[in-house]
Amino acid sequence: MKALQSRFFFFFFFYIFFSVSVSSEAHRRILHQPLFPESSTPPPPDFQSTPSPPLPDTPDQPFFPENPSTPQQTLFPPPPPPVSADVNGGLPIPTATTQSAKPGKKVAIVISVGIVTLGMLSALAFFLYRHKAKHASDTQKLVTGGGDGGGSRRFQEDSGPPTTTSSTFLYMGTVEPTRVSASESNGGTNGPVNSSPYRKLNSAKRSERYRPSPELQPLPPLAKPPQPSDNSPSALSPSSSSSGEECRDTAFYTPHGSAISSDDGYYTAFPRSANGSLPHSKRTSPRSKFGSAPTTAASRSPEMKHVIIPSIKQKLPPPVQPPPLRGLESDEQELPYSQNKPKFSQPPPPPNRAAFQAITQEKSPVPPPRRSPPPLQTPPPPPPPPPLAPPPPPQKRPRDFQMLRKVTNSEATTNSTTSPSRKQAFKTPSPKTKAVEEVNSVSAGSLEKSGDGDTDPSKPKLKPLHWDKVRASSDRATVWDQLKSSSFQLNEDRMEHLFGCNSGSSAPKEPVRRSVIPLAENENRVLDPKKSQNIAILLRALNVTREEVSEALTDGNPESLGAELLETLVKMAPTKEEEIKLREYSGDVSKLGTAERFLKTILDIPFAFKRVEAMLYRANFDAEVKYLRNSFQTLEEASLELKASRLFLKLLEAVLMTGNRMNVGTNRGDAIAFKLDTLLKLVDIKGVDGKTTLLHFVVQEITRSEGTTTTKDETILHGNNDGFRKQGLQVVAGLSRDLVNVKKSAGMDFDVLSSYVTKLEMGLDKLRSFLKTETTQGRFFDSMKTFLKEAEEEIRKIKGGERKALSMVKEVTEYFHGNAAREEAHPLRIFMVVRDFLGVLDNVCKEVKTMQEMSTSMGSASARSFRISATASLPVLHRYKARQDDTSSDSEHSSNSST
């Protein structure tokens, strides 16, 4: 601000100097004409004396009464011209001549310059007045309490005796209407002294940069230090770094903490010269304010060296929000302790911590609980303070706050005391607190393990029921939607008694079981634990001893063990590494496990597991050979049945005639044969009524034809028409009974049968190679050699039956499909088509039987009309047959003629 004032004065004086120099140059130009005024008459003496006095006074009157400062008076250049005019008073003729030449112009210039100068000085004085008044009010609010007193009252409070302490409060960043005192409006001699403390507090750039929230409440001051004279040099030095570090380490109250607290709080009195942490104004230079008059301020009021303001340690990072919240909680918890501080007493020197704790423990039951004052209310006056209440060290306060946030609500209520010894207990975690935290963590972990994270700890744990839960379906109704929660009540007491997990009974069993298993693992565990356990379970399920297995393997008798046991023994076969370990084991066999003892007993027999495989092959050989023999025999019989079925041939003939009639005039007409796949398409062609299909029509025709051929008596034919129709329907329905082997063959896969034959042949080759090993132990090899001869003969027969069945299947396929049989990928597909058609034919026969029963239940008239319609259909079929013969003969004749 002072740089702005000096710049303004410079431009103003430059303008005044330029205007006066112009007027002086005009005056000299007139005085440089010495011969011209001699011829003129001298002016009267009163004309010279009238305008001469205002010349030296005109530039002096607007400046000197308003600005008493002497350095600004030396900048004015106008005084020399009036002095020269007075010195040259002996030359009246030129002066009278110049003033008589242009008196009006000179007077106008002087008057205008004076008016302009007076106006500018007035504006400057008003600007300085407003500026000082505004900053004086801000400084007054920072130092004084409610703004009820002016600057003189503020200085009286600050310059009082050191034994008294100001009860006013300190504001941070608040703005009130401007208040100007008498001492600030005028620039007296005490201006520098009075402006020094306020300018230091009003160093505006720091205050604007770290301005806190406008919701701050008035904070109580702290007692001043005992001997301020010791810190006066460091307080007044602008470059003090130790005071800046002390200021940064000083804690302060947040707005909410101050609102909830009582009148007293934690404050730190520190030197005002710590410019590194003091706020400054944007419009005032810190150096200019601090350099006003430090020595005078220190000599006149030594108490003004220390100003009670909160520390701005936590204001340094303004974007971070959590630190003020932690400060709020910590301040709320520290308030009861701060109420014990004296308000108007001077604190003694800091005592040692032992004496401090001993004194405060005696006064600890006096203060109220911590959170007793409600938030956002003016607290009542504090109780009488104890004689000693120094603030705690500021370096350890953040740790106190973090510990206070971590404790639980129960610990906070039990520890809500105002003694500093309790507060210091929160600085470092005590062994008791650590023990409580460890117990809580252990109990929480045990609950998670025992309850699996989901169970209710209030209910005892039961045995689990492993089921598959079904998700709720909102689009359909299920049986679970009809269940009600109150429809069935459980006897939970009995359930807990029957299915509860007895931790007391199961706990002793667990160590006993663990003490046995590691012993076996350490001494005699050779196999994999899981595999050993599985083998032991299988042995208990089969209920067989080692001696029985050894005897069967030695004699080669598979009937004594059975195929199931032999399959289990094959699964127990150890790996080569395990076999080597078991063979090389030379310790006590009784110490081995059940599985190890069993396998070691079996491995003592030469080629034990190869014998097991050979015996398993022998046990399954007869069953597999029988299955293959029956399968190939079924295929042979199915081929013969399909070729020899007269009724199936009649059915194919009826379908062929019906198809040719329906395809007359098209490329599909005049067919001689068709694939059996066409039989499955007869049900897809429906009549006009939408119910009768082409297969229904064919069945009815075959029924009528079969009934007439089986009955030779004409009287029976015309008299009992319903009887022969029923008889014909029974003949058609018996087609499925005639082709039983065809249905069986349709479920077979010839490739699978061929793979079974190959497997038997490969097993026989293995057995033959195994019997070539030289050994004389037991009768195993003798019995196996006998079986080998029989097996070779049976396999030759099976392979012959396979070739015969395959040839017959191909023959029957060519019998019905002709040359198209070569295109069949599946050799047994013809049996599958016939099987599917027989199923559809059975359903159609049932429907036709139902229709006949409905027709016979009607009256005689309807029965006679039905007979007429039945007999009338016979000539139609004969005519159709005759027409078909004629058309076929004509087509043959035309083909012969064309050739």
From Swiss-Prot:
- Write out the annotated subcellular location: Membrane
Q: Where is the composition biased (Pro residues)?
A: 40-59, 215-228, 316-325, 365-395
UniProt cross-references to SMART domains, sorted A to Z: FH2 (SM00498)
Record-level GO cellular component terms: cytoplasm; membrane; nucleolus; nucleus; phragmoplast; spindle
Q: What protein does this entry describe? A: Formin-like protein 6
* Role this protein plays: Might be involved in the organization and polarity of the actin cytoskeleton.
Query: What does the entry give for GO biological process?
Result: actin nucleation
Top-rank taxon: Eukaryota
Q: Which residues form the FH2 domain?
A: 452-867
- Classification via InterPro entries: FH2_Formin, FH2_Formin_sf, Formin-like_plant
Matching Pfam families, A to Z? FH2 (PF02181)
The membrane spanning regions, by residue number, are: 107-127
User: Where is the region Disordered?
Assistant: 35-99, 136-467
Show which residues constitute the signal peptide.
1-24
Q: What is the lineage of its organism?
A: Eukaryota, Viridiplantae, Streptophyta, Embryophyta, Tracheophyta
What family is reported? Belongs to the formin-like family. Class-I subfamily.
The molecular function terms of the Gene Ontology recorded here are: actin binding; actin filament binding
